[in-house]
């Protein structure tokens, strides 16, 4: 019982002490500020409840003169503080200091010697212009430093000496023009570096080599045009890198290979024009790839993304010119689950592209100008369990009979199994003006089944085949034409032709060099009738102009009383012979060739032709048949004599010269319909396939007694 009063006195004493401390703490809290316990995460993402003094947005001109002794987090954001007096006493346990959005012009105005326990310092959106030598030397425990959105143009080589525990450094949105690797010598533990939105002229080899523990690097928005091959050398722990919003025209393939443990790659918003073979290959740990918002991206070529065994997601969206993805573009990606291809210029996506992705779970191709034909018919054949994202936004824009319909609602049987090539309008512009001696690259891509072959025609009429180099020209296998050191002589109209067994498509571009193209003062067009039959006319033409447009239009008119039946076909630019078939016997035709020039003028020539009667054609056939039999008999006789001579003769060399007989055969008609008459080319090699161009025939006055 005697102990009871003692216990009461002890409890009363503790209560009084606590009350006094609370009163003292309340008294120490700066006027208008809020002092309370708040949740906080350390730079290592460790949760704690910290004693916080919140003086944000109070218009303070000076640092608070007095703070609670146990203050851990001090928030002074959005004030007008210009300096911190050296006589200021800082709480000994201060771990977080936020001075962002103030008027600090120099780090030397901050007495850091008394803040040795600081873990995080926020100085963004001040007026700092430089970081001098050892300016933060006293902050040996600092783990986060935010100096972004200032006016920094100079950082001394030893500015970060003493910050050997720093984990995150934000230098983005300043005025830095170069990166000095000496900055990083004092930062052996740095894991995150932000350097974006600085007018950095270039990155050098080994720029980041001292940062052996760096995991994330952001170099966004600094107008980089190239990345040196060894720029990322030494960063063996780098997992994430962002080149967002730069001016890269191609993937920095060699440099990326040096980041052997890279997991996340952001190349968004760069003017890369195509993803080439091997651009993303053998990156064994890459999980996500971003190639969005690329204004110049036209195609993803064969084996562009290859052997990425851990890749889970590809994002290639909002690319206004991306019109072609090769069937083998994505290869050896066993874990890819998500393929985002929406809001591009894709008219189709090959089934082979999807078949090569065994683990694909979702795909997004909505908001593309889908052509509902043979290439896309696999979508509705119920051969896939892949989830289509936003299927209600997936519409056909072509052909006209399906325009506006949802792709998933068009039955696959309504789409042909084979179809004409289609060169995407976005592949390359219709005209281009370049300076002399510059480099020109034109990307021509087409979709079709069977897959089309692509070649180019120069203004002088030369045919440039894939994988061939000719003078200043080189055509890649995918269809890209390169012209090195172009001069006014090479100016003019270039035409890409895509052709398969079904037909062809073509697209032209006018290239001006120094604002002009070669003049054509003596261009002419001549038509010659080479053969006339009862049901056909074989015609040839010759154009001397160097810069004729490739889409020649041929029209054949037949005068009838009540008929205007037109035939049409497509003829290649470099074919100058055509057999107009399905004509009526004993009928007068007017055959015209109209060739527009690059100056929006046209050269047109017409000839009148009357087809032979059936009786006359029969006599011709009999006469020709007799001559043919006689020729064959004579030929057989000659062959017999030669064989006899060969048997009698005992001499001969097995190494003698071989002779070859060339047989020029007429090609069979393309039997799509009567609107596509057979094409005859007497000089074409059987291994070369030609594009075709539209030809029209209009019948007008067939005699009434003709059937």
UniProtKB/Swiss-Prot annotation:
It comes from Mus musculus. It is a single-pass type I membrane protein. Residues 648-707 are cytoplasmic. SUPFAM superfamilies: Fibronectin type III, Immunoglobulin, L domain-like. SMART domains: IG, IGc2, LRR_SD22, LRR_TYP, LRRCT, LRRNT. Residues 523-614 form the Fibronectin type-III domain. It is found in: Membrane. This is Leucine-rich repeat neuronal protein 3. Residues 23-69 form the LRRNT domain. Keywords: Disulfide bond, Glycoprotein, Immunoglobulin domain, Leucine-rich repeat, Membrane, Repeat, Signal, Transmembrane, Transmembrane helix. Disulfide bonds join 444-496. The chain crosses the membrane at residues 627-647. Residues 1-22 form the signal peptide. Residues 421-514 form the Ig-like C2-type domain. The keyword Disulfide bond applies. Expressed in the brain, in Stronger expression in the ventricular zone and anlage of thalamus, spinal cord, and dorsal root ganglion in 11-17 dpc cerebellum and cerebral cortex in adults. Residues 368-421 form the LRRCT domain. InterPro entries: Cys-rich_flank_reg_C, FN3_dom, FN3_sf, Ig-like_dom, Ig-like_dom_sf, Ig-like_fold, Ig_I-set, Ig_sub. GO terms for biological process: positive regulation of synapse assembly. The keyword Phosphoprotein does not apply. Glycans are attached at residues 93, 103, 223, 382, 522, 579, 608, 624. It comes from the Eukaryota.
């Amino acid at each position: 019982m005697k102990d009871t009063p003692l216990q009461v006195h002890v409890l009363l004493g503790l209560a009084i002490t606590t009350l006094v401390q609370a009163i003292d703490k309340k008294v120490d809290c700066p006027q208008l500020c809020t002092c309370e316990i708040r949740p906080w995460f350390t730079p290592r993402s460790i949760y704690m409840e910290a004693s916080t003094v919140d003086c944000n947005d109070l218009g303070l001109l000076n640092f608070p003169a007095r703070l609670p002794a146990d203050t851990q987090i001090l928030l002074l954001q959005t004030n007008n503080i210009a300096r911190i007096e050296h006589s200021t006493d800082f709480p000994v346990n201060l771990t977080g200091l936020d001075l962002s959005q103030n008027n600090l012009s120099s780090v030397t105005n901050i007495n850091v010697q008394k803040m040795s326990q600081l873990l995080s310092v926020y100085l963004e959106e001040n007026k700092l212009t430089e970081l001098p030598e050892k300016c933060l030397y006293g902050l040996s425990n600092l783990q986060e430093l935010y100096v972004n959105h200032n006016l920094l143009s100079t950082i001394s080589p030893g500015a970060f000496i003493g910050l050997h525990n720093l984990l995150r450094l934000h230098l983005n949105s300043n005025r830095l023009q170069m990166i000095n690797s000496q900055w990083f010598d004092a930062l052996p533990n740095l894991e995150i570096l932000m350097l974006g939105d600085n007018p950095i002229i270039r990155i050098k080899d080994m720029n980041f080599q001292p940062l052996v523990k760096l995991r994330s690097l952001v170099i966004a928005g600094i107008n980089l045009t190239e990345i040196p091959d060894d720029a990322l050398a030494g960063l063996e722990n780098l997992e994430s890198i962002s080149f967002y919003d730069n001016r890269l025209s191609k993937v920095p393939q060699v440099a990326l290979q040096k980041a052997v443990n890279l997991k996340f790659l952001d190349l968004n918003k760069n003017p890369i024009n195509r993803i080439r073979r091997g651009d993303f290959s053998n990156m064994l740990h890459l999980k996500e790839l971003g190639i969005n918002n690329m204004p110049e991206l036209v195609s993803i070529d064969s084996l562009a993304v290859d052997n990425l065994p851990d890749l889970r997601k590809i994002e290639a969206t909002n690319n206004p010119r991306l019109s072609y993805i090769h069937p083998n573009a994505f290869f050896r990606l066993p874990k890819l689950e998500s393929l985002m291809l929406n809001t591009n210029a894709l008219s189709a996506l090959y089934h082979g592209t999807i078949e090569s992705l065994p683990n694909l779970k979702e795909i997004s191709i909505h908001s593309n100008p889908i052509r509902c034909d043979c290439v896309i018919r696999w979508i509705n054949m119920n051969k896939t369990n892949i989830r289509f994202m936003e299927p209600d936004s997936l519409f056909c824009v072509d052909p006209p009979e399906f325009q506006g319909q949802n792709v998933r609602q068009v039955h696959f049987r309504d789409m042909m199994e084979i179809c004409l090539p289609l060169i995407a309008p976005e592949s390359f512009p219709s005209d281009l003006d370049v300076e002399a001696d510059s480099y020109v690259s034109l990307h021509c891509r087409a979709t079709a089944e069977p897959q089309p072959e692509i070649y180019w025609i120069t203004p002088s009429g030369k045919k440039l085949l894939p994988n061939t180099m000719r003078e200043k020209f080189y055509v890649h296998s995918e269809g890209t034409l390169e012209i090195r050191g172009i001069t006014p002589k090479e100016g003019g109209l270039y035409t890409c032709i895509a052709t398969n067994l079904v037909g062809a498509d073509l697209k032209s571009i006018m290239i001006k060099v120094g604002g002009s193209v070669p003049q054509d003062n003596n261009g002419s067009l001549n038509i010659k009738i080479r053969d006339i039959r009862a049901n056909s006319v074989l015609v040839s033409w010759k154009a001397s102009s160097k810069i004729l447009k490739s889409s020649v239009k041929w029209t054949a008119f037949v005068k009838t009383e009540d008929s205007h039946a037109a035939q049409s076909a497509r003829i290649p630019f470099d074919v100058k012979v055509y057999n107009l078939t399905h004509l009526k016997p004993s009928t007068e035709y007017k055959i015209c060739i109209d060739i527009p020039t690059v100056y929006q003028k046209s050269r047109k020539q017409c000839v009148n032709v009357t087809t032979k009667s059936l009786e006359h054609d029969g006599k011709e056939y009999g006469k020709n048949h007799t001559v043919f039999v006689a020729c064959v008999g004579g030929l057989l006789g000659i062959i017999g004599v030669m064989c006899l001579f060969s048997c009698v003769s005992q001499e001969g060399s097995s190494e003698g010269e071989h002779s070859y007989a060339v047989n020029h055969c007429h090609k069979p008609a393309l039997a799509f319909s009567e609107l596509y008459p057979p094409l005859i080319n007497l000089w074409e090699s059987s291994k070369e396939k030609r594009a075709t161009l539209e030809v029209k025939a209009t019948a007008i006055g067939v005699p009434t007694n003709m059937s």
